[in-house]
């Protein structure tokens, strides 16, 4: 670095030849060069710079406008979605209420059906019991009748002898003959 500054210092020892020469004062030359460059840039670059800034401004404004439009569209879609959600919630509540009432109706129908079935089974049971009681009563009657008949036959057989038996048969034959004559 020291060599670079020494070379600039050695340039300062050259003799100046009239009005043109090297200005070795770095600070003075930089300021002059900078002011010339800035002046040229401002004079010629003013239009380009303003065009660039205008283009950039338009792009920013377009981006803002697009963002606003997208935001408004998103808000609109959000409102539509909220409206659909409210509608669906209302329908879901209606389905839930209808479903509960339908379930309640089905439950009552099932209970009624069960009671009817139980009543029918109770009636069948009572009919079966009555039938079995009648059957048992008939069997008891038949048994009593058979025993009474056997007892009567036993009594008759023990009381009847052959002679009494023959007279009873003859009397019955006479009755049958008389009935035959009446019918002829």
From Swiss-Prot:
Subunit structure: F-type ATPases have 2 components, F(1) - the catalytic core - and F(0) - the membrane proton channel. F(1) has five subunits: alpha(3), beta(3), gamma(1), delta(1), epsilon(1). F(0) has four main subunits: a(1), b(1), b'(1) and c(10-14). The alpha and beta chains form an alternating ring which encloses part of the gamma chain. F(1) is attached to F(0) by a central stalk formed by the gamma and epsilon chains, while a peripheral stalk is formed by the delta, b and b' chains.
Compartments where found: Plastid, Chloroplast thylakoid membrane
Bilayer disposition of the protein: Single-pass membrane protein
Comment field (misc): In plastids the F-type ATPase is also known as CF(1)CF(0).
Example of a GO cellular component annotation carried by this entry: proton-transporting ATP synthase complex
CDD domains: ATP-synt_Fo_b (cd06503)
InterPro entries, A to Z: ATP_synth_b/b'su_bac/chlpt
Family: Belongs to the ATPase B chain family.
Taxonomic superkingdom: Eukaryota
Single GO MF descriptor: proton-transporting ATP synthase activity, rotational mechanism
Membrane-spanning ranges: 27-49
Disulfide bonds: none
Pfam family, one: ATP-synt_B
Protein name: ATP synthase subunit b, chloroplastic
């Amino acid at each position: 670095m020291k060599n670079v500054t020494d070379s600039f210092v050695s340039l300062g020892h050259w003799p100046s030849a009239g009005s043109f020469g090297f200005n070795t004062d770095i600070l003075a030359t930089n300021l002059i060069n900078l002011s010339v460059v800035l002046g040229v840039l401002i004079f010629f670059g003013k239009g380009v710079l303003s065009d660039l800034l205008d283009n950039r401004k338009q792009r920013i404004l377009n981006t803002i406008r697009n963002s606003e439009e997208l935001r408004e569209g998103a808000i609109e879609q959000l409102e539509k979605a909220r409206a659909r959600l409210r509608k669906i919630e209302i329908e879901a509540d209606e389905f839930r209420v209808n479903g509960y009432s339908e379930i309640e109706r089905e439950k009552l129908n099932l209970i009624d059906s069960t009671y009817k079935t139980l009543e029918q089974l109770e009636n069948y049971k009572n009919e079966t019991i009555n039938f079995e009681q009648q059957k048992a009563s008939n069997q008891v009657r038949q048994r009593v009748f058979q025993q009474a008949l056997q007892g009567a036959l036993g009594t008759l057989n023990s009381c009847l002898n052959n002679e009494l038996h023959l007279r009873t048969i003859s009397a019955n034959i006479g009755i049958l003959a008389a009935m035959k004559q009446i019918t002829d």
